[in-house]
């Protein structure tokens, strides 16, 4: 699992989003750059008496509200939002990797059972051919076995293609190149008891990545509502300037005057009070609140449904093992003893062995279904997921 968390390209992109949000947050909420103002005028085009003036000034805009603080707050929450998105993607990635691994493990065991079925039916076909030569069996029975054998071999080919697709998906999740082989070494383990499955509530819910993601969006919406109200007042402008003027004064002629001044520009919210943005932000805040409630209900219901399905499937698998599996194993033991005593022929032994393999396959499907439900439950509750130590992955470059 560590390989997937390290190499998966989607997670790399999510981590880059955090870096981007952090960089934006570092410089958010700063004053606008000051403006340098230069001016020059003369009477050259009119009286041409040599009169002129020069002006240089600096203007800086300052907010009259807490707009900059709100901008810094929104930017900081956006970092939390990016981190929650990363954790949520990690949760889903772990689910997908475990699901793919579980599927491949199940397909491997299913293939092993089918290989056993092929060997059994091939031996049975040889047995029937010998009996046909002795006139003790019909070719109809042999044809039925050969048709069944062909069907099993076709199923093996379908399983192989399905396994190849699952391996390709797993390779992508692990961030591996196409030339790297991935092999599932451990077999599917049957549970002896269900893990403790607590309801998703309280702190567990609040720490869920998807809940935190939506909660961060709600927090941003609240801050943006406050920001919209703060934007009713535009920034005031403060100007500091120096002016020099040369003008004609009778009767002394050209004279020079210098001025130093301060100017203030105060915008008045008489026409545009940002009411549209204020109303929109209020509705957006309400919308995110509804979405947060919807996420809360969905997460709780999904966790509860998966918990009930896990309990029902576990009881079904345990009952199936107790009844059908135990019964067919006893039948197999009895038929072998009967064959050793000469009470039945080898054909009956083959048929019971085939039934035994079919029952084992059905039992395998139940355990696979249960394991998949548990994987979904751990992802739905964002529980601490086990690593793949029980399903070792070995990979090597061809």
Predicted regions and their residues:
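Bacterial Sec-pathway N-terminal export signals of envelope proteins
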Residues: 1-40, 62, 70, 136-138, ...
């Amino acid at each position: 699992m560590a390989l997937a968390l390290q190499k998966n390209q989607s997670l790399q992109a999510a981590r880059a989003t955090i870096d981007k949000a952090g960089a934006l947050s570092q410089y958010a909420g700063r004053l606008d750059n000051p403006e340098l103002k230069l001016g020059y005028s003369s009477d050259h085009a009119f009286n041409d008496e040599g009169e002129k003036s020069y002006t240089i000034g600096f203007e800086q805009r300052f907010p009259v509200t807490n707009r900059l603080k709100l901008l810094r707050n929104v930017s900081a929450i956006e970092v939390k939002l990016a981190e929650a998105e990363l954790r949520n993607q990690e949760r889903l990635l772990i689910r997908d990797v475990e699901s793919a691994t579980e599927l491949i493990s199940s397909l491997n065991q299913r293939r092993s059972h089918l290989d056993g079925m092929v060997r059994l039916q091939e031996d049975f076909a040889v047995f029937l051919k010998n009996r046909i030569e002795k006139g003790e069996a019909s070719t109809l029975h042999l044809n039925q076995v050969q048709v069944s054998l062909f069907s099993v071999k076709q199923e093996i080919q379908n399983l192989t293609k399905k396994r190849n697709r699952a391996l390709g998906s797993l390779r992508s999740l692990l961030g591996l190149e196409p030339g790297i082989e991935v092999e599932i070494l451990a077999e599917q383990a049957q549970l002896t008891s269900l893990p403790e499955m607590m309801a998703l509530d309280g702190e567990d819910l609040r720490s869920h990545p998807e809940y935190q993601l939506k909660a961060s969006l709600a927090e941003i919406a609240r801050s943006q509502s406050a920001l919209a109200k703060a934007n009713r007042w535009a920034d005031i402008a403060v100007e500091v300037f120096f002016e020099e003027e040369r003008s004609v004064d009778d009767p002394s002629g050209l004279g020079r005057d210098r001025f130093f001044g301060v100017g203030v520009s105060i915008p008045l919210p008489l026409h545009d009070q940002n009411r549209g943005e204020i109303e929109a932000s209020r509705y957006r805040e309400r919308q995110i609140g509804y979405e947060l409630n919807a996420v809360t209900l969905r997460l709780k219901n999904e966790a509860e449904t998966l918990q009930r399905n896990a309990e029902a499937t576990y009881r079904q698998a345990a009952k199936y093992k107790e009844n059908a599996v135990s019964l067919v194993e006893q039948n197999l033991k009895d038929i072998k003893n009967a064959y050793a005593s000469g009470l039945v022929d080898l054909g009956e032994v083959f048929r019971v062995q085939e039934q035994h393999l079919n029952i084992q396959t059905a039992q395998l499907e139940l355990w696979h279904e249960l394991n998949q439900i548990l994987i979904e439950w751990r992802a739905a509750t964002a529980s601490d997921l086990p690593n793949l130590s029980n399903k070792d992955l070995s990979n090597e470059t061809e």
